Amino acid sequence: MAAPAPGLISVFSSPQELGASLAQLVAQRAASCLEGNRGRFALGLSGGSLVSMLARDLPAATAPAGPASFARWTLGFCDERLVPFDHAESTYGLYRTHLLSKLPIPDSQVLTIDPALPVEDAAEDYARKLRQAFQGDTVPVFDLLILGVGPDGHTCSLFPGHPLLQEREKIVAPIGDSPKPPPQRVTLTLPVLNAAQSVIFVATGEGKAAVLKRILEDQESALPAAMVQPRTGALCWFLDEAAARLLSVPFEKHSTL
């Protein structure tokens, strides 16, 4: 079987330049979608360093569109830890504090888990919310998913060798044995990731260099992040120089200096 295509690789001189370009891309994608046939923009976010990156740059990047445009945004989360929203590990909680307070997206269009439910019920509840928001789609089709990648090659809460990598029926799955704490999580599955119109992986720092070489150069297709191959959508990688330092495959170098 042929190795999967790695997608377009863009390398930036610093995380700050990466973040500014990422925010502009999100704003451009939103504007394009709002002008298109569907008339809405569905964005899926991941946690980690992306929270501070988007909180710093996205409000200014989206400001020219005006506050009324956010009424047609739908925001979901690619995975979530089963913790209260005020917990330091809550992805939604961090975005609520640092980003959503600056963007007038209606609360009803921000799709979250119910952390009070058992993990299996929380996954089913989140799947129901997604199906309601994406009526007409057999599998929810996000306009843009922003994903991270761990040093082990995991993305969302899909970990190497885990049975969830074989899930084909559920759009959202519970995980009760995450090798990375906290152990109970809810995650989008590969069918949803691969149905997206656009997927951007974001990785910064030397700690990601080795796994990025495995994915993008050695093409280790069994790693979860390498299994994200949108069927009809675009796949891009946004890296800083430290994360890209081991790559010899072609990439686009960007700098605003």
Curated annotation (Swiss-Prot):
<keyword id="KW-0963">Cytoplasm</keyword>
<dbReference type="GO" id="GO:0048029">
    <property type="term" value="F:monosaccharide binding"/>
</dbReference>
<feature type="modified residue" description="N-acetylalanine">
    <location>
        <position position="2"/>
    </location>
</feature>
<dbReference type="InterPro" id="IPR006148">
    <property type="entry name" value="Glc/Gal-6P_isomerase"/>
</dbReference>
<dbReference type="GO" id="GO:0017057">
    <property type="term" value="F:6-phosphogluconolactonase activity"/>
</dbReference>
<dbReference type="GO" id="GO:0009051">
    <property type="term" value="P:pentose-phosphate shunt, oxidative branch"/>
</dbReference>
<dbReference type="InterPro" id="IPR037171">
    <property type="entry name" value="NagB/RpiA_transferase-like"/>
</dbReference>
<dbReference type="Pfam" id="PF01182">
    <property type="entry name" value="Glucosamine_iso"/>
</dbReference>
<feature type="modified residue" description="N6-acetyllysine">
    <location>
        <position position="180"/>
    </location>
</feature>
<dbReference type="InterPro" id="IPR005900">
    <property type="entry name" value="6-phosphogluconolactonase_DevB"/>
</dbReference>
<keyword id="KW-0378">Hydrolase</keyword>
<keyword id="KW-0007">Acetylation</keyword>
<feature type="modified residue" description="Phosphoserine">
    <location>
        <position position="49"/>
    </location>
</feature>
<dbReference type="GO" id="GO:0005829">
    <property type="term" value="C:cytosol"/>
</dbReference>
<dbReference type="InterPro" id="IPR039104">
    <property type="entry name" value="PGLS"/>
</dbReference>
<comment type="similarity">
    <text>Belongs to the glucosamine/galactosamine-6-phosphate isomerase family. 6-phosphogluconolactonase subfamily.</text>
</comment>
<keyword id="KW-0597">Phosphoprotein</keyword>
<comment type="pathway">
    <text>Carbohydrate degradation; pentose phosphate pathway; D-ribulose 5-phosphate from D-glucose 6-phosphate (oxidative stage): step 2/3.</text>
</comment>
<comment type="function">
    <text>Hydrolysis of 6-phosphogluconolactone to 6-phosphogluconate.</text>
</comment>
<dbReference type="GO" id="GO:0005975">
    <property type="term" value="P:carbohydrate metabolic process"/>
</dbReference>
<dbReference type="GO" id="GO:0006098">
    <property type="term" value="P:pentose-phosphate shunt"/>
</dbReference>
<protein>
    <recommendedName>
        <fullName>6-phosphogluconolactonase</fullName>
        <ecNumber>3.1.1.31</ecNumber>
    </recommendedName>
</protein>
